């Protein structure tokens, strides 16, 4: 069975859309699944239309300009959420476990390979998703610049 896992980005408590990662130009998302860009309303519409899970990236948290963590927690009550909040280390991963079904470890924000190893040693594998970030056709493996 193929799982349907839609992806939304959050910025200032709204689902947003944009192109090419130019986050300052992102606009509120317009979708057939909801009448607004409210992430919980969108999660409800996605669930009614057969989504199995959803992937949410909190752009404010990733950019350290705020957060949408309560919106993520509420959406997770509607549909299981894989959450990308820009995990940097094992402590950050642990914090997010209360808010989502699975936590994304993005290689672009991770402090080191050792932090990823700590996470894999400490937490159930079914709660972990690794996102390998690529920019300019190169892997972005850890914010420290490490590559292994």
For each feature predicted by the language model, list its residue ranges.
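Hydrophobic faces of well-ordered beta-strands that scaffold small-molecule active sites
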Residues: 3-11, 54-56, 81-85, 103-105, ...
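N-terminal glycine-rich anion-binding loops that anchor highly charged ligand groups
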Residues: 8-17, 45-55
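Conserved anion-binding
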Residues: 10-13, 17-27, 97-148
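Short catalytic helix/loop segments, enriched in acidic residues and glycine
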Residues: 22-44
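Generic structural signal for well-ordered alpha-helices
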Residues: 42-47, 72-73, 93, 113-120
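Glycine-rich, proline-tolerant flexible connector loops at the mouths of alpha/beta enzymes
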Residues: 51-70, 107
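Charged helix-capping and loop-helix junction motifs
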Residues: 66-73, 145-148
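Catalytic cores of alpha/beta
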Residues: 77-103, 118
């Amino acid at each position: 069975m193929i799982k349907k896992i839609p992806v939304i980005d959050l910025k200032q408590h709204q689902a947003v859309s944009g192109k090419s990662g130019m986050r300052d130009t992102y606009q509120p998302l317009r979708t057939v699944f909801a009448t607004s860009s409210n992430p919980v309303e969108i999660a409800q519409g996605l669930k009614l239309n057969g989504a199995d899970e959803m992937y949410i990236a909190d752009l404010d948290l990733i950019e350290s300009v705020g957060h949408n963590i309560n919106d993520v927690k509420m959406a997770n009550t509607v549909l299981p959420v894989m959450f990308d909040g820009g995990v940097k280390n094992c402590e950050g991963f642990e914090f997010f476990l209360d808010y989502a079904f699975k936590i994304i470890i993005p290689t672009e924000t991770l402090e080191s390979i050792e932090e990823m190893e700590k996470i894999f040693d400490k937490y159930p594998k079914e709660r972990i998703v690794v996102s390998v970030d690529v920019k300019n056709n190169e892997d972005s493996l850890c914010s420290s610049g490490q590559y292994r």
